[in-house]
Amino acid sequence: MSVNEKLRSAQHDELFSGILELQTVEECYAFFEDICTVNELKALSQRLQVAKMLRAGDSYETIVEETGASTATISRVKRCLVYGADGYT
């Protein structure tokens, strides 16, 4: 997996280490409720659902209808699936 080195920082390392400490779904809910706004959490979840649907071969139209994602978001996720660091796999 190739990660953009410009993203690497001590703050990001600390965030990811904290996430890796979470052991249950309830701990995840508590952590993300405190660290994200409701809209930020919804956006993250939506992008994961979009990625899943793109990998399954669903059309943009179906994805928009089922997730409410914009075509811009779908395109961004698709670009990450094709050219990204394999973070969605």
Outline where the language-model segments fall.
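Short alpha-helical "recognition helix" segments of helix-turn-helix
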Residues: 62-67, 74
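Short, amphipathic alpha-helical "recognition" segments used to contact nucleic acids or chromatin
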Residues: 44-58
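Short, solvent-exposed alpha-helical "recognition" segments
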Residues: 79-89
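Short, Lys/Arg-enriched anionic-surface-contact patches
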Residues: 26-46
